[in-house]
Amino acid sequence: MKIISAVAASSIALGAVSATTDHVSRMLVLGGAVVPSGTKTYTTGIRPTIDGDNFCGGSLISPTHVLTTTACLRGIKPPNWVSVGTHYLNGTHDGEQIKVVAAQNHTNFNSTSGSFDVALLTLEKPSRFKPVKLPAADDSDIVAGMWSKLVGWGYTGYPEKTKAYELQGVSLQVWDNEQCGQLYPVDDTMVCAGGVKGKDSCDGDTGGPLIKERGPGDEDDIVVGLVSWGSECGVGYPGVYSRVSKALEWINSITKGK
């Protein structure tokens, strides 16, 4: 996820920072708890090697496609493998590890504004795990004030950078875009969530899912956002997530050939 300093975020609120402010990637589940093993199995780790550490997160949205963000495709580490259905940061203890055969960014991605910060990975073979549901195109699955859940393997401590070995989750409240726009230069391809000090995403979670839970199990979970950018980890500002509903046409053009 990309980071704007707390000072810069305050300046944005005062109109002192332009909409072209640079963003810095984030990757952490701060203030969360371990997700029970065997749940949220659509959550995907992106790795350079079959048993290496996940450096980004993603979501299995079809048997052969993982949804993530563009930073995960252009970093130092190559997105060569995904871990699906695993509870752990690395290794081959559980779940499955599948080779990535293609990776592409949204055709409308804007690296300056961060708009359409969405990417897709195509897998060498189908996953046996059930994909997460995609949101409705009319944005009805994401409403200001609702609670959502961020899931990932990012740092659990900041600035000491304590790594999460097990999958973590934290509940975050969704903001109205107009309200969030007083802090950040956001547009309708983004959604803000969080804002409680000590509960946030940061280093390690980039690309991972922001989920709308619709029941006690995972069957009806919907991926409404993807970890994209924000202020320094856990300082009390919301994180900014890619709004998945705005990318559905592009996603379907690849996963369904439409």
Curated annotation (Swiss-Prot):
Residue positions with a glycan: 90, 105, 110
Main location: secreted
GO biological process: proteolysis
Signals that turn on the gene: Expressed during infection and the expression levels increase with disease progression.
Signal peptide: 1-19
Function (record text): Secreted effector that suppresses host plant glucan elicitor-mediated defense responses. Targets host endoglucanases and inhibits the endoglucanase-mediated release of elicitor-active glucan oligosaccharides from P.infestans cell walls.
Subunit and partners: Forms an apoplastic complex with host endoglucanases in tomato leaves during P.infestans infection.
Stated name of the protein: Glucanase inhibitor protein 3
Organism, as annotated: Phytophthora infestans (Potato late blight agent)
Annotated gene: GIP3
